[in-house]
């Protein structure tokens, strides 16, 4: 009887702990949802009340005009940053995944990318100003701002792409090597197509973070209230976060309205990007269809073409270059 009573008390204690943990989980979830809904409601309410077609389709600054230069400039800067970070990020992840014999180099790269992830954006902005704007004489420009954003986007793309590669079943990769496939074939036929959804998630995360940055752009892109940049260098660029940062500090109601509208556009854009990344299986299937033919092209360029030249060379008796 005494033993049954002890078992009953233990079961009751475990049940009480489970209930308490569940309640705490629900409270945490409710708290986060309350904060998220409050932010969305406050921003969208303020932006929707002030938005108009004229504001969305005209250039301006925080005291006059609209936010079209900010909308276009934001995505120009993000696109430029993606241009500078996508290829190094993906190929860096390929190296981290395939570099079995150079583990110390791969570990050093992971350390550097982790450190780069934690660098404050204002430090990247200061570096961009001193090195890109002044030292390399790019001026306040699309290239300088895009490079600053690319530095920030690079570690996110690299590490998430690496994790996507490592989630692929190792047996598939080893079987491909056992059948005689080289690194190019494994990368283009297995890694890239199967990890395409994860790569997309990393890209969208980097884009979402870059679209909301302000500090490094103040140092590298300045602001253009006259319209779009006239060139890649020595021409400032407008962006939405400037409207938010500068407009909310102005005394006029018009500047506050532009700040709310810009914040609303940003939060809606980021939400759409996140939703796309959540439905990565659908987008991933589309990317696999695109990357499949790309793998065939790369295979023909890097693998089949050299082998054909080798066959032709050996048929003529030109074998000395092999030695």
Residue spans for each PLM region:
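Interhelical loop and adjacent transmembrane-helix boundary motif
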Residues: 63, 217-268
């Amino acid at each position: 009887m005494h033993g049954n009573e002890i078992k009953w008390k233990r079961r009751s204690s475990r049940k009480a702990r489970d209930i308490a943990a569940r309640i705490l989980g629900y409270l945490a979830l409710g708290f986060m949802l309350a904060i998220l809904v409050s932010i969305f409601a406050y921003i969208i309410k303020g932006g929707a009340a002030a938005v108009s077609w004229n504001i969305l389709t005209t250039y301006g600054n925080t005291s006059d005009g609209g936010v079209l230069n900010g909308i276009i400039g934001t995505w120009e800067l993000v696109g430029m940053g993606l241009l500078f970070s996508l290829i190094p990020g993906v190929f860096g992840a390929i190296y981290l995944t395939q570099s079995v014999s150079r583990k110390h180099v791969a570990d050093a790269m992971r350390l550097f990318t982790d450190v780069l992830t934690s660098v404050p954006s204002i430090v990247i902005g200061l570096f961009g100003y001193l090195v890109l704007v002044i030292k390399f004489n790019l001026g306040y420009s699309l290239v300088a701002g895009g490079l600053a954003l690319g530095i920030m986007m690079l570690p996110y793309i690299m590490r998430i792409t690496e994790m996507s590669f490592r989630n692929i079943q190792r047996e598939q990769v080893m079987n491909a090597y056992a059948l005689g496939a080289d690194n190019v074939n494994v990368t283009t036929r297995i890694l890239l197509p199967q990890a395409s959804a994860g790569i997309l998630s990393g890209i969208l995360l980097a884009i979402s973070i870059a679209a909301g940055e302000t500090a490094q752009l103040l140092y590298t892109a300045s602001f253009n209230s006259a319209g779009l940049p006239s060139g890649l260098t020595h021409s400032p660029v407008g962006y939405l976060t400037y409207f938010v940062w500068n407009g909310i500090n102005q005394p006029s109601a018009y500047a506050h309205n532009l700040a709310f509208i810009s914040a609303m556009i940003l939060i809606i854009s980021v939400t759409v990007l996140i939703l796309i990344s959540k439905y990565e299986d659908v987008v991933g299937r589309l990317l696999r269809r695109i990357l499949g033919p790309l793998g065939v092209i790369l295979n023909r360029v890097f693998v089949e073409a050299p082998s054909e030249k080798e066959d032709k060379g050996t048929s003529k008796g030109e074998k000395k270059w092999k030695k």
